[in-house]
Amino acid sequence: MTQRYRVTVAYDGTDFAGFQVQPKQRTVQGTLEKALTKMSKGAYIQVYGSGRTDSGVHAMGQVVHFDYPSELPAKSMLRALNSLLPLDMEVVDSQLADDDFHARFSTVGKRYMYRVDLGHYTNPFKRRYTGHYPYPIDVERIKAALSDVMGTHDYTSFAAAGGVIKDKVRTIYEATVVYNEAENELIFEFHGNGFLYNMVRILVATLLEIGNGRRDVHDFLRLYEVKDRQQARSTAPASGLYLKEVYYK
């Protein structure tokens, strides 16, 4: 009798080639499956994630599910996995799940965070965990623009090439920015019902250009209309992006 588990994982994405298994690459999915295979004495156990994170993207709350060949208490699964995982990955929560739970298809929303270091020079201790924008920024302009980010829109201009999803309409419930004076960082957060490929990184890059005065405060309204990726142009680095939380019914 197999038991389905819902597991929440945190990881430093710097040294992973993304979430999804790739031949001869170190990936989050592959690392989890390797640990589970060892636990199950060689039986292959497939891991399903809430979504793929790219190389260099971090997670505080990536959710996965898998079917294990025997039932262990949830806390025992957490301890066993953590004893086998590398130092840049940790299981932060483990729960027994119903058979109809699916880490990807049961989601109703996600929350992402993006950190931007505003220092004049690249900080060697932050470069793996933040984006870097060494230009003048008016945070009030960004806050004004965020009101246009929220709502239901066609985000075609903010979807990178390579995505396979045709429907580009998404709803952003919350979009915020906070200036952390102690760290000289901007902290963006976005909560939506779903996100397109590289969407958060493109949104952040566009907001930074608005904050710098390179774009009109309400340029998002124009970008929704033109539906042209080339009009948004820039993509913020993967290093500043964190999958913070995945929401379920």
Curated annotation (Swiss-Prot):
Keywords: Isomerase, tRNA processing. Pfam families: PseudoU_synth_1. PANTHER family: PSEUDOURIDYLATE SYNTHASE, TRNA PSEUDOURIDINE SYNTHASE-LIKE 1. Its EC number is 5.4.99.12. SUPFAM superfamilies: Pseudouridine synthase (SSF55120). Gene3D superfamilies: Pseudouridine synthase I, catalytic domain, C-terminal subdomain, Pseudouridine synthase I, catalytic domain, N-terminal subdomain. One of its GO terms (molecular function) is RNA binding. It comes from Latilactobacillus sakei subsp. sakei (strain 23K) (Lactobacillus sakei subsp. sakei). Transmembrane segments: none annotated. The keyword Ribosomal protein does not apply. Homodimer. The active site is at D54. Signal peptide: none annotated. Belongs to the tRNA pseudouridine synthase TruA family. GO terms for biological process: tRNA pseudouridine synthesis. It is an enzyme of class 5 (isomerase). Formation of pseudouridine at positions 38, 39 and 40 in the anticodon stem and loop of transfer RNAs. It catalyses: uridine(38/39/40) in tRNA = pseudouridine(38/39/40) in tRNA. This is tRNA pseudouridine synthase A. Substrate binds at Y112. NCBIfam families: hisT_truA.
